[in-house]
């Protein structure tokens, strides 16, 4: 469903005229803002299948800091692996990395087996440190949940289920105007929560192993 479709879906539900573009009026622009607020809330509520992707980086000998190009500092890593040497990378904390690189007279070199996040670059992409310091070219793969940028063009499409986004935007619009002549704001939020929980339940069925907790 497109950005414009969702905005018009919200407008209809609060008894407003549809628009031919999200930027038609100040009010439709505000509804667009509510749609993006709702989108962010829904995307952050669950590790949606539609948001899962793989980011790769290729190492160089002697370099241990790399940008995850395209991450835009808006990812959750599910797992990471050294695809060249065929094993999973293990996350280590900043103190561990500082000890290996700063407290040691000579940092070990070899095939990378550990990673840590270390800021963002000038493009806004997440920076990753790896250890040992690569001694050759290795391909590292990061399986991530990649949250999407705000919708902006009328034709932009939503990746996550649209009903929770639409109904949460309706709730936000109803709260802003104070009344809708029918359903209360609290009821709108309850409806949105119901759509969200149903959508999560359906998507979670694709990843049942992620709902098993071990003590």
Please give the residue ranges for each predicted region.
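Glycine-enriched, solvent-exposed interface loops adjoining structured elements
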Residues: 1-215
């Amino acid at each position: 469903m497109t950005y414009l479709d969702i905005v018009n879906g919200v407008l209809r539900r609060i008894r407003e005229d549809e628009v031919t573009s999200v930027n038609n009026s100040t009010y439709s622009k505000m509804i667009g803002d509510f749609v993006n607020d709702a989108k962010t809330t829904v995307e952050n509520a669950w590790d949606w299948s539609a948001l899962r992707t793989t980011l790769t980086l290729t190492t160089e000998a002697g370099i241990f800091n790399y940008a995850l190009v395209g991450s835009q500092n808006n990812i959750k890593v599910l797992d990471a692996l050294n695809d060249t040497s065929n094993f999973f990378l293990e996350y280590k904390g900043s103190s561990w990395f500082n000890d290996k690189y700063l407290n040691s007279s000579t940092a070990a070199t070899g095939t990378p087996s550990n990673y840590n996040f270390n800021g963002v670059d000038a493009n806004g992409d997440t920076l990753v440190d790896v250890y040992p310091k690569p001694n050759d070219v290795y391909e590292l793969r990061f399986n991530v949940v990649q949250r999407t940028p705000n919708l902006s063009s009328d034709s932009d499409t939503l990746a996550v289920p649209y009903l929770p986004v639409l109904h949460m935007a309706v709730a936000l619009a109803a709260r802003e105007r104070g009344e809708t002549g029918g359903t209360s704001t609290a009821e709108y939020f309850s409806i949105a929560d119901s759509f969200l929980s149903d959508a999560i339940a359906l998507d979670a069925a694709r990843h049942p192993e992620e709902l098993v907790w071990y003590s």
